[in-house]
């Protein structure tokens, strides 16, 4: 198994825990996009990008991609915390995701990261992912 950062693991769980029913299931592109938007929101709050805990590249199609996050997603799938359907779309196993997050109750930064991830998901409810991709590609 490839390595991943603890923060990418938390975020991969938090995305699934906070994902509104109306957005389910999500693609791996959306998974990375929601994480990236959380990082951008943290930047706007005055946090250094390096403090996010893992990095991104932007694909030639304009989507953010994090190897650490992808490795975390792969781990969640192997552990049965998330399901992948025949179209490659992800949905949570809610009970297992919630229980796993509870194992990290002692991590002080989780509530803040949860709020950033939740806000990034709320953006998806009002801004089409294509518009977000266009903005990322042109920066």
What residue spans do the PLM features occupy?
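Domain-edge interaction signal
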Residues: 1-139
């Amino acid at each position: 198994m490839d390595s991943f950062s603890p923060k990418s693991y938390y975020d991969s769980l938090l995305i699934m825990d906070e994902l509104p029913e109306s957005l389910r299931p999500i693609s791996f592109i959306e998974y990375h996009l929601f994480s990236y938007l959380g990082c951008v929101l943290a930047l706007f709050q005055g946090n250094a990008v390096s403090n996010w805990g893992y990095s991104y590249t932007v694909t030639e199609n304009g989507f953010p991609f994090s190897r650490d996050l992808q490795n975390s997603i792969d781990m969640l799938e192997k552990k049965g915390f998330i399901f992948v359907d025949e179209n490659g779309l992800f949905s949570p196993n809610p009970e297992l995701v919630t229980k796993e997050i509870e194992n990290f109750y002692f991590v002080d930064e989780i509530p803040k990261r949860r709020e950033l991830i939740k806000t990034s998901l709320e953006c998806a409810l009002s801004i089409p992912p294509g518009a977000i991709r266009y903005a990322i590609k042109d920066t």
